[in-house]
């Protein structure tokens, strides 16, 4: 064969490999996107990474990074399509075409900011040149560690974890009570990596280990679901979903409509026997404690009906900054405790690179004051006892709810306003609520401005859920529970453990004995 023909065959083979790599990345990213709500084909989580992992065994590092990033970009673009629901922003004074550009830019930017983490993971997995169980341990520890680190700090956006896609799988999700969402994520990555090793090496032992691991997850879930729920003090919880359009909510007429809607909802729930009422995030879009409170008509209703309320509005500090706050009002309409939103939405409520992009971001928000974040040590005392609270983005972070439950909270409440976004966001947010309920072994009650509002029991089962973009006011029985899950006691113990196992696999693979033993693993 001539040199030209040989070179041509090599080029054709390389082209085929390149196409195969792109297909593996796009296919894996698409599978992850379909696994997430609202499609909710969660079973795909257990195999979605297999094509990419198989392909990466023979791929060099720079290309591995771009293929991993491509897989992540496809995944997050599907997952975060609800960001396009920002458009149109004409009610904020932004023209139609610039509004569309802002929505598209936000969608692509946030997707890319998450996708590169998968690219880095793929690159490092390839760079280590590990194989067998060492590769599996390293892949698991690295995935868990990188995503945990990226979930820290002001710009953290821990949305779209593999556990979130498995939240609707009642057998699988029980695992999070043992080690939180990160444990379930690690198990899913381990199954993917073991299947990929089996495929690449043609050794059925790895597939057997993967099947054993997955079976253990589901057997534990089956056993847990067969147990009766613990007894606890019963509580009739009322929820109001006002369904006030975002474009109208911030106008003078809209504020009057808001007050009328929530006063009516409160009256309905009090008449239906509610013992505690929850409103959505900023249900009352103004400073609650100012002397001329626009929500004054609600106060005599509370004093007459004597049903306490967890009411969300703004709270202002002496320095002029405001917080998104839950006010615990007793039967006399007195504020007995408050909870300020802990995790502010990046590029919305808190602004990285403030000097550079601050003016633009403020133009996109109806709240013009500086927003301050609450502390992790907050405790919301209510007339029914200590309650673990979260507001909007807080439910993406397990640490706040866990800390409050460890301090004695017997119920979780989540107050949110998802009216900014498209309909795909609501089921994803609801999946986070299910994770938080199972992690802590508590009922979770969620109130959303436009849906969905829901009640989730300690096993992740939804006992009540509303529609999207509808008004709703309902009463649902829950129980105030005590006792601690392993996760509530120990937190994210799996994160350092997986990091240690990854390091162990890396060290073993680098040692002379480890290099000699690669053929046997």
From Swiss-Prot:
Its main location: membrane. Keywords: Acyltransferase, Cell inner membrane, Cell membrane, Membrane, Transferase, Transmembrane, Transmembrane helix. Pfam families: CN_hydrolase, LNT_N. It is found in: Cell inner membrane. One of its GO terms (molecular function) is N-acyltransferase activity. The keyword Transmembrane applies. CDD domains: ALP_N-acyl_transferase. One of its GO terms (cellular component) is plasma membrane. PROSITE patterns: CN_HYDROLASE. Residues 240-480 form the CN hydrolase domain. GO terms for biological process: lipoprotein biosynthetic process. Belongs to the CN hydrolase family. Apolipoprotein N-acyltransferase subfamily. This is Apolipoprotein N-acyltransferase. It comes from Gloeobacter violaceus (strain ATCC 29082 / PCC 7421).
